[in-house]
């Protein structure tokens, strides 16, 4: 089955020193392109036969491997961001200066690095060695050797056997150039200020106990009916008459001129004023910016009023990342 777009696991507007614009561009363009290209490569692989030249098969399999790595590493990278608003002096997950690692993390890595400070110095130096170039820096845990180490992955596909990355830093220039230019050192420092240590510690526990990878999709915590952007695209293609509601907050809409093609913007704070404009016997798909609370809450209200409503996982950002069509808002056109 095709690789689906994973909803972004962090609220881009909550990061400290990293702009929402850069994170969204990274997600929609770079991550989205990796998913779309992976699906295209797999479609081509499915058409090959015994007459396919060996070099063509070899090239496609290498490309598939690299793209699989890019997709996974991007998802993990976004998933370990967002700690600035979660951690604090009294949370047990951070320190007042935002530069010390939490005690629980230090306890995990000290045996392999000597101290948390020594780990951080090596991780930072490794990242700085990639400045101006490209690649990933990973803190990886080897299940076979029962130890952590920092590694470089320069083409998305340099993964160790039976090992799992638990902290990921994207050092490709697209990850920081928009905000930091060539100042990779400032980006690395800002990255540390935004690490979601809670997510990192959960990954460590999952890996060490040989449990399946965590589902870091923010919509996985609700039982409100939902659909993926791929499922929404199928509904549209099948002519189901789905009504698409853009429920992004007014202040968010004031900064954007586009919306999903076929959608109508509705103020999420004034559902009672526009709900009568919907057709009761047709399905409704509701999306917000990134698939967190807003679209989910509007969907709950519509369901309570008898509508067959679902919220779109990942919001409009996931739709754009999938290559979905967009249109100008009527007021902006």
Where does each model-flagged region fall?
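Rhodanese-like catalytic fold shared by cysteine-dependent sulfurtransferases
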Residues: 209-242, 250-285, 290-333
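Feature for soluble, non-membrane regions of globular proteins
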Residues: 1-217
């Amino acid at each position: 089955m095709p690789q689906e777009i994973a909803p972004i696991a962090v609220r881009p507007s909550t990061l400290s020193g990293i702009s929402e614009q850069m994170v969204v561009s990274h997600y929609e363009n770079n991550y989205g392109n990796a998913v779309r290209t992976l699906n295209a490569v797999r479609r081509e692989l499915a058409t090959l036969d015994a007459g396919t030249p060996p070099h063509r098969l070899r090239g496609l399999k290498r490309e598939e491997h690299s793209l699989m790595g890019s997709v996974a590493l991007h998802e993990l990278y976004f998933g370990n961001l967002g700690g600035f608003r979660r951690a604090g002096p009294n949370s047990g997950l951070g320190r007042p200066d935002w530069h010390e690692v939490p005690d629980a993390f230090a306890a995990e890595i000290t045996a392999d690095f000597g101290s948390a400070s020594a780990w951080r110095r090596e991780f930072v130096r490794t990242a700085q060695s990639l400045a101006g170039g490209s690649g990933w820096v990973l803190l990886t845990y080897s299940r076979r050797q029962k130890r952590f180490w920092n590694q470089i992955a320069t083409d998305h596909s340099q993964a160790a056997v039976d090992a799992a990355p638990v902290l990921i830093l994207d050092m490709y220039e697209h990850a920081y150039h928009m905000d930091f230019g060539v100042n990779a050192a400032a980006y690395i420092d800002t990255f540390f200020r935004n690490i979601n240590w809670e997510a990192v510690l959960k990954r460590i526990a999952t890996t060490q106990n040989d449990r399946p990878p965590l589902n870091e999709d923010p919509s996985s915590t609700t039982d409100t009916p939902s659909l993926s952007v791929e499922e929404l695209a199928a509904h549209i293609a099948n002519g189901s008459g789905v009504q698409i509601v853009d429920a992004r907050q007014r202040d968010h809409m004031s900064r954007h001129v586009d919306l999903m093609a076929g959608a109508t913007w509705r103020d999420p704070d004034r559902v009672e004023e526009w709900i009568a404009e919907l057709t009761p016997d047709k399905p409704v798909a509701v999306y917000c910016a990134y698939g967190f609370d807003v679209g989910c809450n509007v969907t709950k209200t519509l369901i309570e009023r008898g509508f067959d409503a679902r919220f779109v996982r990942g919001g409009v950002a996931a739709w754009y990342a999938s290559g979905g069509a967009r249109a100008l808002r009527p007021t902006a056109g």
